[in-house]
Regions:
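N-terminal "arm"/small-domain region of PLP-dependent enzymes with the aminotransferase-like
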Residues: 1-27, 32
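Phosphate-binding glycine-rich loop
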Residues: 27-74, 88-90, 98-100, 122
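A short beta-strand submotif of the Rossmann-like class I SAM-dependent methyltransferase core
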Residues: 52, 77, 129-132
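Structural detector of well-ordered beta-strand residues that form the stable sheet scaffold
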Residues: 76, 97, 156-157
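Short beta->alpha connector loops at strand-helix junctions that form conserved
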Residues: 79, 97-103
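Conserved coil-to-alpha-helix start sites within the AMP-binding
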Residues: 81-86
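Structured binding elements
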Residues: 93
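Active-site phosphate-binding strand-loop segment of PLP-dependent enzymes
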Residues: 104-177
């Protein structure tokens, strides 16, 4: 029987020494290493800003809070992601609904999203936010998502926890550009 690993990591001796050095320093979370790390992440992600946090869950919550949405506003995401993707909106007082996934990529189905948006527009119940997950290293088509965002006036959070550093053609995943 073959065992399939969900994920693997490579941690070198240099990594261990670097982490140990920070752990022994006076400034664990707000020191020069954190600033250097944030600058590297900013460059890697192709974003204007970067903020180091303890987890992807915290990053999603901060992103959601930064949008200044109102309690009761509607947001949509996928049903097959880690619970933090849904929880971040709920913790901000938003109401959740789900969009079905693409059977080939397991990401949000752009086609099903567009159909759901058309129906929601007729009912006057459009979402203020879509949280798209780039699941398992397979990115959502950001160009189509952005086009729908402009047409239906919703904000986008890209959860790139599974695809960090990835690209969709030449566009870096997760920067909502």
């Amino acid at each position: 029987m073959n065992n399939l690993k969900y994920s693997t990591q490579t941690i070198s001796k240099k990594d261990i020494i670097s982490v140990s050095k920070v752990l022994k320093s006076e400034l664990l979370t707000q020191g020069p290493v954190t600033i250097k790390f944030e600058n590297k992440i900013k460059n890697l992600a192709g974003s204007k800003y970067a903020l180091a946090v303890n987890s992807g869950s915290s990053a999603l919550l901060l992103a959601c809070k930064a949008l200044s949405l109102k309690p009761g506003d509607l947001f949509w995401t996928v049903p097959n992601s880690f619970v933090a993707t849904a929880n971040c909106g709920i913790l901000c007082g938003l109401k959740i609904d789900f969009v079905d996934i693409d059977n080939d990529t397991w990401n949000i189905s752009i086609e099903k999203l567009e159909n759901k948006l058309k129906i929601a527009k007729k009912k006057g119940k459009l979402p203020k936010l879509i949280i798209a997950v780039h699941l398992g290293g397979l990115p959502v088509n950001p160009l189509k998502l952005k086009k729908l965002s402009k047409k239906y006036k919703f904000k986008i959070i890209e959860d790139a926890s599974h695809s960090f550093g990835g690209k969709y053609y030449l566009r870096k995943v997760g920067c909502s550009k």
